[in-house]
């Protein structure tokens, strides 16, 4: 009877996307729950490409089988822009990004947040030990992933940030939306084409989906100064091509696993008001993934 009562007390969360079958978020949040004692259950919520809103709404209204109510979800590709439209209220960073990766099902209306940028900043500064303040930074891509991290990166005060994209017009639109924030923090913010984005950056972040498709790195090696940090938001096998490219050109390659864990911790805090410890979870997850790849 106690086990059944404990299950009924667990609030439900999920990761919503297409696809989500291989998502590591359930592992991460299960570890966060164990470390914090928070009573949650976290699963996967596959959404058809034309049915994101309906699927998430049905999940929010469901009661579950032997579990508590649905309280929120993470949102992954390709629905981060759609998630904004479902919310009654946006956090400032979700409003600026116009993309959300976290929904909270409050009784007075759904709340949307974007924790990607906070996760990336913490991974770079804490886990990689690289300072963003005063650095020169190239952010490659202008889709939902880039939109989610641009604001938090600007808030750290880099000297210069260039947003490079296959379509420069799309990059310019994102730059214009963030111009006031860049000015507030004294950052030179520019848009550029992939083949004309400068050289010698301290930090290069790949926010494109090129790695997922097995495509080559969309910029030339001249963007890397010797010893630069080169980070791909992907992880596991998808990131290996980028990491090999970085190493071959004298850069320190890093995948997106630390960002994944840190954005999850930020989501957990948004939902529960508790900030879980992350170093042990990151180490455990990396061991699991590297073990699966051997």
Swiss-Prot record:
Per UniProt, the keywords (alphabetical) are:
Amino-acid biosynthesis, Aromatic amino acid biosynthesis, NADP, Oxidoreductase
Q: Which SUPFAM superfamilies match?
A: Aminoacid dehydrogenase-like, N-terminal domain, NAD(P)-binding Rossmann-fold domains
**Residues bound to shikimate:** 23-25, 76, 101, 116, 235
Does this entry carry the keyword Amino-acid biosynthesis? yes
Q: Where is the active site?
A: 80
What HAMAP family has UniProt attached to this entry? Shikimate_DH_AroE
Where, in this chain's numbering, is NADP(+) bound?
141-145, 233, 256
Assembly state and interactors?
Homodimer.
Q: What does this protein do?
A: Involved in the biosynthesis of the chorismate, which leads to the biosynthesis of aromatic amino acids. Catalyzes the reversible NADPH linked reduction of 3-dehydroshikimate (DHSA) to yield shikimate (SA).
Tell me a Gene Ontology molecular-function term this record carries.
Answer: NADP binding
Transmembrane intervals: none
What's the name of the protein?
Shikimate dehydrogenase (NADP(+))
Q: What family does this chain come from, according to its entry? A: Belongs to the shikimate dehydrogenase family.
Instruction: Please name the InterPro entries in this protein's record.
Output: Aminoacid_DH-like_N_sf, NAD(P)-bd_dom_sf, SDH_C, Shikimate_DH, Shikimate_DH-bd_N, Shikimate_DH_fam, Shikm_DH/Glu-tRNA_Rdtase
Which superkingdom does the taxonomy of this entry point to?
Answer: Bacteria
Can you supply one Gene Ontology CC term for this chain's record?
Answer: cytosol
One GO biological-process annotation of the entry reads: amino acid biosynthetic process
Which Pfam family is one of those matched by this entry?
A: Shikimate_DH
The reaction(s) catalysed by this protein are:
shikimate + NADP(+) = 3-dehydroshikimate + NADPH + H(+)
E.C. number: 1.1.1.25
Q: In which pathway does it act?
A: Metabolic intermediate biosynthesis; chorismate biosynthesis; chorismate from D-erythrose 4-phosphate and phosphoenolpyruvate: step 4/7
């Amino acid at each position: 009877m106690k086990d059944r009562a404990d299950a009924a007390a667990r609030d439900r969360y999920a990761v919503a996307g297409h696809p989500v079958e291989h998502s590591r978020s359930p592992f991460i949040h299960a570890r966060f729950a164990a470390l914090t004692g928070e009573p949650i259950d976290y699963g996967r919520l596959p959404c058809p490409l034309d049915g994101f809103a309906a699927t998430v709404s049905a999940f929010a209204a469901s009661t579950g089988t032997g579990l508590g109510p649905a309280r929120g979800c993470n949102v992954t590709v390709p629905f981060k822009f759609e998630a904004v439209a479902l919310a009654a209220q946006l956090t400032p960073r979700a409003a600026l990004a116009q993309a959300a990766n976290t929904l909270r099902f409050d009784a007075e209306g759904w709340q949307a947040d974007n924790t990607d940028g906070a996760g990336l900043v913490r991974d770079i500064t804490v886990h990689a030990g690289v300072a963003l303040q005063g650095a020169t930074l190239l952010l490659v891509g202008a889709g939902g992933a880039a939109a989610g991290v641009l604001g938090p990166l600007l808030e750290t005060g880099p000297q210069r940030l260039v947003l490079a994209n296959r379509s420069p017009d799309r990059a310019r639109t994102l730059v214009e939306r963030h111009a006031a924030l860049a000015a507030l923090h004294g950052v030179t913010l520019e848009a550029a084409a992939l083949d004309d984005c400068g050289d010698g950056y301290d930090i290069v972040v790949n926010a494109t989906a090129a790695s997922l498709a097995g495509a080559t790195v969309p910029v030339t090696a001249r963007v890397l100064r010797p010893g630069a940090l080169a980070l791909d938001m992907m992880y596991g096998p998808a990131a290996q091509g980028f990491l090999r490219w970085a190493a071959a050109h004298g850069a320190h390659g890093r995948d997106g696993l630390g960002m994944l864990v840190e954005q999850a911790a930020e989501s957990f805090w948004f939902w529960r008001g508790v900030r879980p410890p992350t170093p042990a979870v990151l180490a455990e997850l990396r061991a699991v993934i590297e073990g699966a790849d051997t």
